[in-house]
């Protein structure tokens, strides 16, 4: 489903732990990392799409998280011309996204990025709150900056109430 301007409606998901760190996922078979995200199906609300994508990409359900915030507006990014599929109709030039900030309620061992037949990710790790803004692929960077800035007032008090351990930069694979 592509809108009249060529943007695909999509949801993005920022999952934080009680220390205010965020889940950073490695794209399957690639060296790039990002937050979970995915398209909104026809007839689906952004919140419904978020819960579906949460399960598909991270293996978590409603009971495993709490919604702390969502972005007020749709945020857009354009795909680089080399990634646009010009032979499809309608042509998708980018994504418009509604973002959700979730707090993890379950044990982190319940996170399973490889539970589906076609996983989006092959590993994940906790990183400091602002780390993704510097590390995401360049064409998504402005959206990530805006999302993290909007959610900062919710997450920063969590970080202040707990002494933070250093972020681990080794990533986790789902156990076989």
Curated annotation (Swiss-Prot):
Nudix hydrolase domain sequence ranges: 6-149
Keyword set, alphabetical order: Hydrolase
Cofactor(s) the protein needs: a divalent metal cation
Gene3D superfamilies: Nucleoside Triphosphate Pyrophosphohydrolase
UniProt entry tagged with the keyword Lipoprotein: no
Cross-referenced InterPro entries: Nudix_hydrolase, NUDIX_hydrolase-like_dom_sf, NUDIX_hydrolase_CS, NUDIX_hydrolase_dom, RppH
Protein name: RNA pyrophosphohydrolase
